[in-house]
Protein backbone atom coordinates (compact mmCIF):
# COMPACT_ATOMS: atom_id res chain seq x y z
CA UNK A 1 0.00 0.00 0.00
CA UNK A 2 1.25 3.46 -0.75
CA UNK A 3 2.65 5.37 2.19
CA UNK A 4 0.11 7.43 4.12
CA UNK A 5 1.31 10.14 6.48
CA UNK A 6 -0.41 10.72 9.78
CA UNK A 7 -0.17 14.49 9.42
CA UNK A 8 -3.00 16.47 10.94
CA UNK A 9 -5.83 17.07 8.51
CA UNK A 10 -8.63 19.55 8.80
CA UNK A 11 -11.82 17.74 9.73
CA UNK A 12 -15.13 19.16 8.67
CA UNK A 13 -18.65 18.03 8.07
CA UNK A 14 -20.58 15.32 9.84
CA UNK A 15 -17.63 12.89 10.04
CA UNK A 16 -15.63 15.31 12.19
CA UNK A 17 -17.82 15.04 15.29
CA UNK A 18 -17.71 11.23 15.28
CA UNK A 19 -13.95 11.05 14.67
CA UNK A 20 -13.16 13.58 17.38
CA UNK A 21 -15.33 11.68 19.86
CA UNK A 22 -13.68 8.40 18.87
CA UNK A 23 -10.17 9.78 19.24
CA UNK A 24 -11.14 11.23 22.62
CA UNK A 25 -10.90 7.59 23.74
CA UNK A 26 -7.10 7.64 23.25
CA UNK A 27 -5.24 7.24 26.53
CA UNK A 28 -2.57 9.76 27.44
CA UNK A 29 0.53 7.59 27.66
CA UNK A 30 4.29 7.81 27.24
CA UNK A 31 5.00 4.14 27.98
CA UNK A 32 2.82 1.10 27.31
CA UNK A 33 3.32 -2.63 27.89
CA UNK A 34 1.14 -5.70 27.46
CA UNK A 35 1.30 -9.42 26.93
CA UNK A 36 -0.75 -10.53 23.94
CA UNK A 37 -1.90 -14.11 23.53
CA UNK A 38 -1.97 -14.83 19.79
CA UNK A 39 -3.73 -17.61 17.91
CA UNK A 40 -2.33 -17.54 14.37
CA UNK A 41 -3.33 -19.47 11.26
CA UNK A 42 -2.68 -19.15 7.53
CA UNK A 43 -2.89 -21.37 4.45
CA UNK A 44 -0.10 -23.60 5.71
CA UNK A 45 0.05 -23.64 9.51
CA UNK A 46 -1.54 -22.84 12.84
CA UNK A 47 0.32 -21.87 15.98
CA UNK A 48 -0.21 -20.18 19.33
CA UNK A 49 2.33 -17.87 20.90
CA UNK A 50 2.66 -14.87 23.20
CA UNK A 51 3.85 -11.44 22.14
CA UNK A 52 5.29 -9.31 24.93
CA UNK A 53 4.87 -5.73 23.68
CA UNK A 54 6.58 -2.58 24.95
CA UNK A 55 6.21 0.88 23.49
CA UNK A 56 7.42 4.39 24.00
CA UNK A 57 5.03 6.77 22.33
CA UNK A 58 6.13 8.02 18.88
CA UNK A 59 9.59 6.58 19.50
CA UNK A 60 9.92 2.79 19.64
CA UNK A 61 7.99 -0.48 19.48
CA UNK A 62 9.57 -3.65 20.92
CA UNK A 63 8.10 -7.15 20.69
CA UNK A 64 9.34 -10.44 22.16
CA UNK A 65 7.82 -13.55 20.55
CA UNK A 66 7.51 -16.46 22.98
CA UNK A 67 6.39 -20.02 22.33
CA UNK A 68 5.40 -22.82 24.73
CA UNK A 69 6.97 -22.73 28.20
CA UNK A 70 7.98 -19.10 27.62
CA UNK A 71 10.81 -19.99 25.23
CA UNK A 72 11.70 -16.88 23.25
CA UNK A 73 11.89 -17.38 19.49
CA UNK A 74 12.65 -13.86 18.37
CA UNK A 75 12.44 -10.14 18.88
CA UNK A 76 11.23 -7.23 16.80
CA UNK A 77 12.35 -3.63 17.18
CA UNK A 78 10.67 -0.84 15.22
CA UNK A 79 11.87 2.76 15.25
CA UNK A 80 10.59 5.75 13.33
CA UNK A 81 12.51 4.74 10.20
CA UNK A 82 13.62 1.10 10.54
CA UNK A 83 12.59 -2.41 11.54
CA UNK A 84 14.95 -4.99 13.04
CA UNK A 85 14.07 -8.66 13.58
CA UNK A 86 16.10 -11.45 15.15
CA UNK A 87 15.21 -15.15 15.00
CA UNK A 88 16.96 -16.82 17.91
CA UNK A 89 16.05 -20.30 16.70
CA UNK A 90 17.67 -19.94 13.26
CA UNK A 91 20.34 -17.46 14.42
CA UNK A 92 19.31 -14.97 11.73
CA UNK A 93 18.53 -11.27 11.72
CA UNK A 94 16.83 -8.82 9.40
CA UNK A 95 17.33 -5.08 9.04
CA UNK A 96 14.99 -3.11 6.76
CA UNK A 97 13.38 0.34 6.37
CA UNK A 98 9.99 0.67 8.01
CA UNK A 99 8.36 0.25 4.57
CA UNK A 100 9.10 -3.48 5.01
CA UNK A 101 5.99 -3.63 7.22
CA UNK A 102 3.88 -3.78 4.06
CA UNK A 103 5.07 -7.41 3.70
CA UNK A 104 3.65 -8.28 7.09
CA UNK A 105 0.44 -6.25 7.06
CA UNK A 106 -1.55 -4.80 4.15
CA UNK A 107 -0.64 -1.30 5.26
CA UNK A 108 2.52 0.74 4.92
CA UNK A 109 2.65 3.20 7.73
CA UNK A 110 4.73 5.22 10.14
CA UNK A 111 5.50 4.30 13.74
CA UNK A 112 2.95 6.56 15.48
CA UNK A 113 0.18 5.20 13.29
CA UNK A 114 1.30 1.61 13.89
CA UNK A 115 1.11 2.29 17.62
CA UNK A 116 -2.41 3.68 17.20
CA UNK A 117 -3.33 0.51 15.29
CA UNK A 118 -2.03 -1.72 18.11
CA UNK A 119 -3.94 0.31 20.68
CA UNK A 120 -7.16 0.01 18.67
CA UNK A 121 -7.67 3.65 17.74
CA UNK A 122 -9.31 5.27 14.74
CA UNK A 123 -6.62 5.87 12.08
CA UNK A 124 -6.13 9.15 10.25
CA UNK A 125 -4.76 9.42 6.70
CA UNK A 126 -3.71 12.80 5.32
CA UNK A 127 -4.45 11.84 1.70
CA UNK A 128 -8.05 10.71 2.22
CA UNK A 129 -10.72 12.89 3.80
CA UNK A 130 -13.18 10.89 5.93
CA UNK A 131 -16.86 10.88 5.05
CA UNK A 132 -19.77 9.89 7.29
CA UNK A 133 -21.95 7.24 5.62
CA UNK A 134 -24.71 6.92 8.21
CA UNK A 135 -25.73 3.90 10.28
CA UNK A 136 -24.98 0.36 9.15
CA UNK A 137 -25.87 -2.57 11.42
CA UNK A 138 -26.63 0.04 14.12
CA UNK A 139 -23.02 1.30 13.92
CA UNK A 140 -21.72 4.64 12.65
CA UNK A 141 -19.88 4.06 9.35
CA UNK A 142 -17.04 6.39 8.36
CA UNK A 143 -15.14 5.95 5.10
CA UNK A 144 -11.83 7.47 4.01
CA UNK A 145 -10.97 6.71 0.39
CA UNK A 146 -8.31 7.55 -2.16
CA UNK A 147 -7.51 6.04 -5.59
CA UNK A 148 -5.15 3.61 -3.82
CA UNK A 149 -6.94 2.54 -0.64
CA UNK A 150 -10.15 2.59 1.36
CA UNK A 151 -10.55 2.63 5.13
CA UNK A 152 -14.00 1.79 6.52
CA UNK A 153 -14.60 2.16 10.25
CA UNK A 154 -17.67 1.29 12.28
CA UNK A 155 -18.13 2.97 15.66
CA UNK A 156 -20.34 1.98 18.56
CA UNK A 157 -22.98 4.72 19.05
CA UNK A 158 -22.72 4.54 22.86
CA UNK A 159 -19.12 5.73 23.21
CA UNK A 160 -17.71 5.96 19.65
CA UNK A 161 -15.14 3.21 20.17
CA UNK A 162 -14.22 1.04 17.19
CA UNK A 163 -16.36 -2.01 16.55
CA UNK A 164 -14.93 -2.99 13.16
CA UNK A 165 -12.52 -1.65 10.56
CA UNK A 166 -11.65 -2.70 7.02
CA UNK A 167 -8.54 -1.46 5.25
CA UNK A 168 -8.40 -2.24 1.53
CA UNK A 169 -5.40 -1.79 -0.76
CA UNK A 170 -6.90 -1.34 -4.21
CA UNK A 171 -3.57 -1.49 -6.02
CA UNK A 172 -2.23 -4.72 -4.51
CA UNK A 173 -5.52 -6.52 -3.84
CA UNK A 174 -4.94 -6.71 -0.10
CA UNK A 175 -7.49 -6.34 2.67
CA UNK A 176 -7.43 -6.38 6.47
CA UNK A 177 -10.59 -6.82 8.56
CA UNK A 178 -10.41 -6.13 12.29
CA UNK A 179 -13.08 -6.57 14.96
CA UNK A 180 -12.72 -5.05 18.44
CA UNK A 181 -14.25 -6.71 21.50
CA UNK A 182 -13.98 -7.06 25.29
CA UNK A 183 -13.62 -3.38 26.10
CA UNK A 184 -12.40 -2.39 29.56
CA UNK A 185 -11.05 0.85 31.04
CA UNK A 186 -7.36 1.77 31.03
CA UNK A 187 -6.26 5.17 32.33
CA UNK A 188 -9.90 6.23 32.24
CA UNK A 189 -10.23 5.38 28.54
CA UNK A 190 -11.97 2.51 26.74
CA UNK A 191 -9.56 -0.20 25.55
CA UNK A 192 -10.30 -3.28 23.44
CA UNK A 193 -8.73 -6.34 25.07
CA UNK A 194 -9.69 -8.76 22.30
CA UNK A 195 -9.23 -8.41 18.53
CA UNK A 196 -9.77 -10.64 15.54
CA UNK A 197 -7.75 -9.84 12.42
CA UNK A 198 -8.35 -11.38 8.99
CA UNK A 199 -5.87 -10.54 6.24
CA UNK A 200 -6.13 -11.39 2.56
CA UNK A 201 -3.02 -10.93 0.42
CA UNK A 202 -3.69 -12.29 -3.06
CA UNK A 203 -4.24 -16.03 -2.60
CA UNK A 204 -2.95 -15.96 0.97
CA UNK A 205 -5.33 -15.77 3.92
CA UNK A 206 -4.27 -15.41 7.51
CA UNK A 207 -6.08 -14.93 10.80
CA UNK A 208 -4.91 -13.68 14.17
CA UNK A 209 -6.93 -13.72 17.37
CA UNK A 210 -5.39 -11.41 19.98
CA UNK A 211 -6.08 -11.22 23.71
CA UNK A 212 -4.36 -8.41 25.63
CA UNK A 213 -3.37 -9.15 29.24
CA UNK A 214 -1.17 -7.60 31.95
CA UNK A 215 -1.45 -4.07 30.61
CA UNK A 216 0.84 -1.48 32.18
CA UNK A 217 0.75 2.22 31.36
CA UNK A 218 3.39 4.88 32.06
CA UNK A 219 5.87 2.57 33.77
CA UNK A 220 9.36 3.28 32.42
CA UNK A 221 10.55 0.43 30.17
CA UNK A 222 13.74 -0.81 28.59
CA UNK A 223 14.05 -2.34 25.14
CA UNK A 224 16.87 -4.92 25.12
CA UNK A 225 17.88 -5.87 21.59
CA UNK A 226 21.21 -7.30 20.51
CA UNK A 227 22.30 -8.77 17.19
CA UNK A 228 24.90 -11.40 18.02
CA UNK A 229 28.15 -11.46 16.02
CA UNK A 230 27.43 -14.99 14.80
CA UNK A 231 23.99 -14.12 13.43
CA UNK A 232 23.49 -14.21 9.67
CA UNK A 233 21.71 -11.33 7.92
CA UNK A 234 18.76 -12.33 5.70
CA UNK A 235 16.23 -10.51 3.52
CA UNK A 236 13.15 -12.12 5.05
CA UNK A 237 12.38 -14.00 8.27
CA UNK A 238 9.66 -16.47 9.11
CA UNK A 239 9.19 -17.87 12.60
Listing of model-derived features with the role each one plays in the protein:
Residues 130-239:
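Gly/Pro-enriched, hydrophobic low-complexity segments
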Residues 31-36, 48, 64, 78-80, ...:
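Extended beta-sheet lipid-handling architectures
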Residues 39-41, 68, 185, 202:
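Hydrophobic lipid-interacting interfaces of membrane-associated proteins
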Residues 61-112:
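An acidic-aromatic
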Residues 1-46, 236-239:
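N-terminal leader/targeting segments and the immediate start of mature chains
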Residues 24-32, 43-47, 54, 58-59, ...:
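Edge/loop elements at the starts and ends of beta-strands within beta-rich repeat scaffolds
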Residues 104-107, 115-135:
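C-terminal low-complexity, charged extensions that often adopt amphipathic alpha-helices
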Amino acid sequence: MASHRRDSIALSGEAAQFIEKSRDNKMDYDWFASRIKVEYSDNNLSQDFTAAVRMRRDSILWISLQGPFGIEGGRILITRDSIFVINKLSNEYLRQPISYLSRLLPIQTNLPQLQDFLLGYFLMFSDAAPDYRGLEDSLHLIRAESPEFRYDSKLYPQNYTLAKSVLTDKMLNQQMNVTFDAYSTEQGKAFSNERNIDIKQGNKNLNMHLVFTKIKVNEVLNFPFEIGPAMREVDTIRF
